[in-house]
Regions:
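Acyltransferase donor/substrate-recognition loop-hinge adjacent to the catalytic core
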Residues: 119-193
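Intrinsically disordered, low-complexity, positively charged segments
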Residues: 12-38
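Conserved donor-binding loop and adjoining core beta-sheet/short helix segment
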Residues: 28-110
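A structural signal for well-ordered alpha-helical scaffolds and beta->alpha junctions
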Residues: 8, 12, 152-153
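Long, contiguous, compositionally biased segments that the model treats as domain-scale units
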Residues: 2-8, 19
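Short acidic (Asp/Glu) patches
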Residues: 87-88, 117-121
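Residue-level signal for secondary-structure boundary elements
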Residues: 23, 27, 96-100, 167, ...
């Protein structure tokens, strides 16, 4: 059985180490993202055999597992494949014990390749654009030009009307305390949700 818990700041070092071993580059595997979105996405984590497992409850009783951090997904050695097989077996046992559908989320190309090598023809993969990282062109974001960014323009316009005395400042040693005060106020007003 996997001992799941809600991520806490005490998990940072172990999570960071696991992400480094996996050469993780996706936003969803950064501990800051895991920690900040733990409530919104019902994220639970567990550590076992040097690996960090994640479980998402995106909707009530709709769970998704992730492949663990702490494996090098570019390493197709027998030892690494065996560790992956053991990890997947542990996740499958957890799903069975808790009567959850056994399904994964956030499978990158390197993870997919190693998973297919370890479990030929065992899994079906479906791309879901709703779960994809997105990248904006810096020029587009700076100008908010075009129909695609209309909602963002409206949001900025509403913000500027609501907070007419807003100004942009780089955060430095002279205004760090003010920035933290504003962050604390915002955090309190939003019930601790980012």
């Amino acid at each position: 059985m996997i001992d799941w818990h809600i991520p806490t700041l005490h998990d940072f070092e172990a999570a960071q180490k696991a992400a480094e071993i996996s050469h993780s580059m996706i936003n969803d595997e950064a501990f800051s993202t895991i920690f900040l979105y733990r409530k919104k996405f019902g994220i639970m984590i567990a550590f076992r055999d040097g690996l960090m497992f994640r479980l998402y409850e995106l909707e009530p009783e709709n769970f998704y597992y992730t492949l663990p951090l702490g494996l090098d997904y570019s390493d197709s050695s027998m030892e690494n494949l065996e560790r992956l097989k053991d990890a997947v077996a542990a996740l499958k046992s957890d799903a069975d014990a808790n009567r959850r559908r056994f399904k994964f989320i956030l499978i990158t190309d390197d993870k997919k390749a190693l998973l297919e090598q370890a479990f030929p023809l065992r899994f079906t993969f479906t791309e879901n654009p709703d779960f994809s990282d997105y990248v904006y062109n810096a020029q587009s974001m700076a100008n908010l030009a075009g129909k695609k960014l209309q909602k963002k323009r409206n949001h900025v316009s509403h913000f500027m009307k609501t907070y007419s005395d807003v100004r942009f400042e780089l955060i430095n040693e002279h205004n760090t305390a003010d920035a933290l005060k504003i962050e604390d106020q915002w955090f309190s007003e939003n019930n601790g949700e980012f």
